[in-house]
């Protein structure tokens, strides 16, 4: 009989996986979190907690010793008592910075309250209000501790008791309590911290962790990591996540280890910062999910100029979780780390993929492995063995109890002292999550082989995109509304193809029409396009496959449901191949109805280039195909430009002409004009049509201060089949086109261009950065002409810009542009100016040129002369803004704000952006968006930005 897959880990077994030969010693065994902070202060008073905020530089690390932090939070806890809340009251902590969250949590604990960490609220008003109301009902009351920004986000919900952290800090200044003061002596089984689930399958549940569950987890984690009081730990995971607060804060605190907590945006915006911090702070333990490992590797493996630049010998372990870790990605990352190191032979660390959930205090199963010395056996890294005290087993998912043999897949269940005790005020959900014997049903499908676990799927209704869980039921609800889909005969199922780095999904559905009918191709094409559009707009990802299955062949369970697991199984076995083939046949037929075969040699050559970029058959390419409707991105534009120039032997095909001529036949005509040297200087037209499909009101987007509009390409594709998207590009890029000399000249030109493109209102105008004030003036001009402007979008720009324009000299403008283009890091853009200013322009350009990644220069087709000219264009726009003084008003403004170039986000909003209200006749809207000033529309942030932006358009009736 095969062995049964039940695994537990003892101290002896775990020792094999300790990443350091040092012994992890906890001086005493604390029973509560109160004991943890007291012990840390007594034993290591001068060890430090460091913080890098969302807007700080590497040199701006704010630190507090354990002793100073302890005194600070106890004073805050004393001030909290003035709220008059009874012991055990739940306080919802809604803050963004690590230090603020950490401070608030400890203050709540010491005051005898129970903190509940609230992740970022939805940008969708209805969803946000529904969630906050749910939290209020769940806890029976609603006490929130937040910032001014957070308070503004929840001010539309009545019945909340809101306290500002800034006011609490002021109140605490009058107290100096004893270093061991507490308002309440906690007990091990008291509720300690509540964590909210993602809410991916409905409203969030509140996971209850006691002092006992948290300490059981943290002790075992620290032993697994080999932590000591001399360790240095780096964390950038948000504090509202169990990995950030428990795994990377309380665990090292338990062992007396110093910590550095970095805002996630600081790492994502500048991946090199992670390496600099490992080098400068001798970091031993860090965390990086698969998508960050992949991003770091892509960004750094070609930076040959950085090879040998860092001392990375201190790093011993990098934990990874949130999504499966691709083995090849882990190996490439480890190899790149060695190349970047000053002493590659001294670099020896493990990448430890792991399994954990909010319900298990984050990671409880790990597989630390040196991926360069030990080649992974599977496509994804194994997840390993349980930490001390944790057990795991694989069972039949139907009954949740019958054990599966070693090597056979089934439902993963875990148990141990680190597993949560219950869901707050939700006995039904708690009961359904456990089976006899105290085993917790994780909802994941796994395999245990020789004591090592790996996942093979998921029972729960979620799909993970770059580490973020999205609820499948909610997605299906919207997909069911598409014309052509038979009601209740649609299922979306997670799927990861072999070799694919991130998870995707497949849509299975039964069409309302006959797949063999006369008009089947037209209806199928429209249905699939509508399904794709909903997916992109809801979860930022199109389906990998859409499989139409006739109703009479779509089997349901006895409960009348579609089985996602069964559909995926049929797909993998090839049993749906006939339906997929029929779908492809009909879609080809639909394309054929509008198919125009490329006829000229130029059209054929461009069609071949298009096919190569989009991985399509050359025979499928039509002369009427639009580059952006095929899915073209800003990076694809550069590739098309480069390949076109090489094929036709042209010195340059201007990027703007690709944007203006995205259709094969139109671009071919332009190329032919270049080849015949018959391309006369075109009359300047600021309008660049990036997306022309859809019937809703078009959106016009004014360029940022660099004048170019390539930044909008990735945003525009989200508006396909919804509304046209036009960008306005500055004058001066093309030969014979002079720069603008005043704001009035620019606004007059742009307003006239908008009117030529869309004769009558209502209008929707937006501008990014500098373009925001231009958009405001264009909106005023259109209203003065008697037209209605229903939307004026202002992206991270204040109304008063003249002072800032006067601050920017040629050097500052050149460095801003260079950072925007990805030629230099934010760190260099901020620090180089004093050294460059005494140099000549050519010398300054030469310095930046040498710092620029060679592949980026090739990608942008830049030369020193082109960069110099581009700086002059940006400079001309700065000159136009030096005398700008806003006046008048528009019907309403929608302001979108991100992390500013300098200063805090709160100051940026309240003191710089809020004055827009004085220029809005209606209610002004202020909406927080992810990212920093220069990154809010980049590849990583545009999926979220488009959802938020489109939400505001809808709110304005567009």
Curated annotation (Swiss-Prot):
<dbReference type="Pfam" id="PF00501">
    <property type="entry name" value="AMP-binding"/>
</dbReference>
<dbReference type="InterPro" id="IPR000873">
    <property type="entry name" value="AMP-dep_synth/lig_dom"/>
</dbReference>
<keyword id="KW-0597">Phosphoprotein</keyword>
<dbReference type="InterPro" id="IPR042099">
    <property type="entry name" value="ANL_N_sf"/>
</dbReference>
<keyword id="KW-0808">Transferase</keyword>
<protein>
    <recommendedName>
        <fullName>Atromentin synthetase greA</fullName>
        <ecNumber>2.3.1.-</ecNumber>
    </recommendedName>
</protein>
<dbReference type="InterPro" id="IPR045851">
    <property type="entry name" value="AMP-bd_C_sf"/>
</dbReference>
<comment type="similarity">
    <text>Belongs to the ATP-dependent AMP-binding enzyme family.</text>
</comment>
<comment type="function">
    <text>An L-tyrosine:2-oxoglutarate aminotransferase and atromentin synthetase greA catalyze consecutive steps to turn over L-tyrosine into atromentin, which represents the generic precursor molecule for the entire terphenylquinone and pulvinic acid family of pigments, which are widely distributed secondary metabolites in homobasidiomycetes. The first step catalyzed by the aminotransferase converts L-tyrosine in to 4-hydroxyphenylpyruvate (4-HPP).</text>
</comment>
<dbReference type="InterPro" id="IPR001031">
    <property type="entry name" value="Thioesterase"/>
</dbReference>
<dbReference type="InterPro" id="IPR020845">
    <property type="entry name" value="AMP-binding_CS"/>
</dbReference>
<dbReference type="InterPro" id="IPR009081">
    <property type="entry name" value="PP-bd_ACP"/>
</dbReference>
<dbReference type="InterPro" id="IPR050237">
    <property type="entry name" value="ATP-dep_AMP-bd_enzyme"/>
</dbReference>
<dbReference type="GO" id="GO:0016740">
    <property type="term" value="F:transferase activity"/>
</dbReference>
<dbReference type="Pfam" id="PF00975">
    <property type="entry name" value="Thioesterase"/>
</dbReference>
<dbReference type="InterPro" id="IPR029058">
    <property type="entry name" value="AB_hydrolase_fold"/>
</dbReference>
<keyword id="KW-0596">Phosphopantetheine</keyword>
<comment type="pathway">
    <text>Secondary metabolite biosynthesis.</text>
</comment>
<feature type="region of interest" description="Thiolation and peptide carrier (T) domain">
    <location>
        <begin position="602"/>
        <end position="672"/>
    </location>
</feature>
<feature type="region of interest" description="Thioesterase (TE) domain">
    <location>
        <begin position="698"/>
        <end position="946"/>
    </location>
</feature>
<dbReference type="GO" id="GO:0009058">
    <property type="term" value="P:biosynthetic process"/>
</dbReference>
<dbReference type="InterPro" id="IPR036736">
    <property type="entry name" value="ACP-like_sf"/>
</dbReference>
<feature type="modified residue" description="O-(pantetheine 4'-phosphoryl)serine">
    <location>
        <position position="634"/>
    </location>
</feature>
<feature type="domain" description="Carrier">
    <location>
        <begin position="597"/>
        <end position="675"/>
    </location>
</feature>
<dbReference type="InterPro" id="IPR020802">
    <property type="entry name" value="PKS_thioesterase"/>
</dbReference>
<dbReference type="Pfam" id="PF00550">
    <property type="entry name" value="PP-binding"/>
</dbReference>
<feature type="region of interest" description="Adenylation (A) domain">
    <location>
        <begin position="60"/>
        <end position="465"/>
    </location>
</feature>
């Amino acid at each position: 009989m095969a062995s049964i897959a039940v695994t537990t880990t003892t101290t002896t077994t775990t020792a094999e996986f300790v990443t350091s030969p040092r012994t992890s010693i906890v001086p005493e065994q604390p029973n509560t979190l109160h004991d943890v902070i007291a012990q840390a202060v007594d034993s290591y008073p001068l060890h430090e907690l460091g913080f890098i905020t969302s807007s700080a530089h590497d040199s701006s690390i704010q630190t507090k010793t354990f002793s100073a932090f302890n005194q600070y939070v106890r004073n805050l806890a004393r001030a909290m008592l003035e709220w008059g809340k009874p012991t055990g009251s739940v306080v919802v902590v809604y803050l963004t910075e690590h230090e603020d969250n950490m401070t608030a949590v400890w203050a709540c604990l010491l005051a005898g309250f129970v903190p509940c960490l609230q992740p970022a609220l939805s940008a969708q008003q209805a969803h946000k209000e529904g969630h906050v109301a749910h939290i209020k009902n769940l806890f029976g009351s609603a006490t929130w501790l937040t910032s001014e920004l957070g308070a503004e986000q929840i001010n539309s919900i009545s019945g909340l008791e809101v306290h500002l952290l800034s006011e609490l800090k002021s109140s605490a200044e009058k107290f100096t309590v004893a270093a061991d003061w507490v308002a309440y002596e906690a007990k091990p089984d008291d509720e300690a911290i509540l964590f909210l689930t993602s809410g991916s399958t409905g409203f969030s549940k509140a996971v209850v962790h006691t002092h006992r569950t948290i300490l059981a987890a943290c002790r075992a984690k620290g032993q697994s990591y080999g932590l000591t009081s001399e360790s240095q730990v780096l964390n950038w995971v948000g504090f509202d996540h169990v990995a950030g607060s428990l795994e990377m804060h309380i665990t090292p605190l338990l062992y007396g280890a110093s910590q550095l907590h970095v805002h996630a945006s600081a790492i994502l915006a500048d991946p090199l910062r992670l390496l600099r911090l490992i080098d400068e702070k001798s970091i031993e333990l860090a965390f990086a999910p698969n998508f960050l490992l992949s991003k770091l590797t892509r960004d750094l493996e070609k930076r040959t100029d950085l090879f040998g630049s860092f001392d990375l010998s201190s790093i011993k372990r990098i934990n990874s979780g949130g999504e499966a870790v691709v083995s090849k990605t882990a190996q490439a990352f480890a190899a790149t780390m060695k190349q970047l190191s000053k002493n590659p032979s001294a670099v020896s660390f493990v990448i430890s993929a792991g399994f954990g959930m909010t319900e298990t205090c984050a990671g409880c199963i790990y597989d630390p492995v040196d991926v360069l010395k030990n080649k992974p056996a599977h496509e994804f890294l194994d997840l390993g063995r349980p930490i001390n005290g944790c057990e795991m087993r694989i069972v039949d998912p139907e009954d949740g109890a019958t054990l599966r043999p070693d090597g056979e897949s089934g439902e993963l269940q875990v148990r141990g002292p680190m597993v949560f005790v219950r869901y707050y005020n939700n006995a039904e959900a708690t009961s359904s999550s456990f089976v006899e014997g105290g085993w917790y049903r994780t909802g994941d499908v796994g395999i245990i082989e020789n004591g090592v676990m790996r996942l093979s799927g998921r029972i729960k209704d979620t799909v993970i995109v770059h580490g973020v869980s999205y609820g499948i039921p909610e997605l299906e609800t919207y997909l069911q509304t598409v014309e052509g889909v038979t009601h209740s005969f649609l299922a979306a199922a997670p799927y990861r193809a072999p070799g694919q780095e991130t998870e995707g999904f497949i849509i299975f559905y039964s069409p309302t029409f006959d797949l063999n009918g006369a008009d089947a191709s037209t209806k199928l094409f429209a249905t699939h396009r509508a399904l794709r559009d909903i997916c992109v707009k809801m979860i930022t990802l199109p389906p990998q496959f859409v499989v139409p299955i006739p109703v009479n062949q779509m089997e349901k369970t006895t409960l009348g449901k579609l089985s996602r697991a069964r559909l995926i199984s049929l797909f993998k076995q090839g049993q749906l191949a006939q339906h997929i083939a029929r779908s492809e046949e009909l879609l080809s037929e639909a394309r054929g109805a509008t198919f125009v075969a490329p006829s000229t040699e130029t059209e054929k050559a461009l069609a071949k280039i298009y096919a190569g970029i989009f991985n399509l058959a050359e025979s499928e390419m039509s002369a009427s195909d639009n580059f952006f409707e095929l899915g073209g991105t800003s990076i694809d534009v550069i590739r098309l430009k480069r390949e076109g120039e090489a094929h036709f032997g042209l010195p340059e095909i201007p990027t703007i002409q690709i944007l203006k001529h995205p259709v094969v036949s139109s671009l071919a005509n332009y190329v032919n004009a270049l080849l015949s040297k018959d391309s006369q200087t075109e009359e300047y037209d600021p309008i660049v049509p990036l997306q022309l499909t859809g019937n809703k009101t078009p959106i016009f987007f004014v360029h940022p201060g660099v004048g170019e509009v390539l930044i909008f390409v990735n945003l525009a594709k989200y508006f396909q089949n919804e509304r046209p998207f036009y960008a306005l590009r500055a004058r001066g890029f093309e030969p014979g086109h002079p720069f603008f000399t005043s704001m009035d000249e620019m606004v007059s030109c742009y307003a006239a261009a908008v009117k030529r493109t869309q004769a009558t209102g209502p209008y929707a105008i937006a501008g990014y950065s500098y373009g925001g004030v231009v958009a405001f003036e264009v909106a005023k001009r259109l209203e003065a002409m008697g037209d209605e402007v229903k939307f004026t979008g202002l992206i991270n720009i204040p109304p008063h810009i003249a002072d800032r324009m006067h601050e920017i000299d040629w050097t500052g403008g050149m460095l801003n542009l260079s950072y925007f283009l990805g030629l230099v890091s934010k760190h260099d853009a901020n620090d180089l100016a004093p050294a460059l200013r005494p140099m000549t322009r050519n010398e300054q350009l030469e310095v930046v040129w040498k710092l620029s990644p060679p592949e980026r220069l090739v990608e942008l087709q830049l030369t020193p002369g082109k960069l110099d000219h581009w700086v002059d264009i940006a400079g001309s726009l700065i000159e136009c803004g030096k005398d700008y003084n806003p006046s008048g008003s528009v019907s309403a403004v929608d302001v979108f704000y991100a992390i500013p170039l300098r200063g805090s986000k709160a100051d940026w909003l309240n003191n710089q952006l809020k004055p827009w209200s004085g220029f809005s006749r209606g209610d002004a809207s202020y909406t927080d968006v992810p990212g920093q000033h220069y990154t809010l529309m980049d590849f990583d942030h545009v999926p979220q930005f488009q959802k938020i932006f489109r939400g505001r358009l809808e709110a304005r009736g567009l």
